[in-house]
Amino acid sequence: MSMAQGESCGADTVVADTTVVKKKTWIDKFLDYFNDANKNKKHKKFDFSIIGGPHYNSDIKFGLGLVAAGLYRTCPTDTLLPPSNVSLFSDVSTVGFYLLGIRGTNIFPQDKSRLKYTIYFFSFPSGFWGIGYDSCDNDDNGSEMKRWQARIKASYAVRLSKNLYLGPIVAYDYIHSSRVTRPELLNGQDASIWNLGLGVQLMYDSRDVLTNPHRGYYLNVEQSFRPKFLGNKYTFATTEIETSVYARPWRGAVLAYDFRTMLNFGNPSWAMMALFGSSNSMRGYYEGRYRDKHKFETQLELRQHVWKRNGVVVWGGFGTVFSKFEQLQFRRLLPNWGFGYRWEFKKNVNVRLDYGFGKPGQRGFIFNINEAF
């Protein structure tokens, strides 16, 4: 028995002596982090990851962005419930721009209601060309201002029937501008303003995935009011409509179409005008170079999966700004096109790198998370 014990100990000793646990380097841990980021983690209550990268565009020049994405289910046992999402985003650039914000959609159990929210603030030495297509299209009107802006917007929509939702919205905006080089372009309006708005939202949403749709239809109509009794100096009403449709023409491809419009009725301030260009629509334009009471934008995008977690996109579109509907003319249409790269950061959450082009001199590189629409 003692020999058996001795042999057992000897065997154990040999195993212990020959087993070497290789310690992972920080590079191994870094690669493992991104290799595992897009795996479906239904066992985790909250799946959260962070990534950063450089970018360049015509308004904030060279910058470094940091984004984080989180996925979760309000009812973990309901696998048919679409995951809720939250994104944190921050940015700094060489011209003194900085941004910090959070946005997301919380889908309540059984998808009976949805809470959508956006909170951000930024500081930016921005350009300003005035109000209206003709003024904004004139390069000689280029001026500068130091702008600090904050926004809080939230909507709570209750499901009325399959894919149909209705509910209230609230929005607060504060804009402080200083060092305005050409104040006459403000048309006598205050350089710093705030607005509080209340309204209602009607939404139809049959998209299969909110962050990276492959098929389905989306229609969102928002009607908001900023009356005087809420303390607003500039009183107006805003109608916003966005509609998108998604189809799969062949394997690995998604064809996505988007149309959106913003119509302001009343007396909106220069800071609350409809702005042309953003990271989601008319990509590549200096955001706010063109501004007026109304705008419309439309775009068609082809998204193609290439290999593993990699994909590419191309898009084209056009739009314009206007103060009266009779100003809608072909010569005032602003073209837009571009291409981009996609990397699946998390399951159905893409990091997107886009390079967009507009009129001559209007172009930009965008680093962001989730699809543009």
Which role fits each region the language model picked out?
Residues 198-203, 207-305:
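C-terminal outer-membrane beta-barrel translocator/porin domains of Gram-negative envelope proteins
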Residues 2-41:
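Sec-dependent signal peptide cleavage junction
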Residues 40-50, 55-190, 194, 350-351, ...:
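Gram-negative/organellar outer-membrane beta-barrel architecture
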Residues 61, 97, 147-149, 195, ...:
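Membrane-spanning beta-strands of outer-membrane beta-barrel proteins
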Residues 199-200, 339-345, 362-373:
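Outer-membrane beta-barrel "beta-signal"
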Residues 37-46, 74-83, 109-114, 159-163, ...:
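Short loop/turn motifs that connect adjacent beta-strands in outer-membrane beta-barrel proteins
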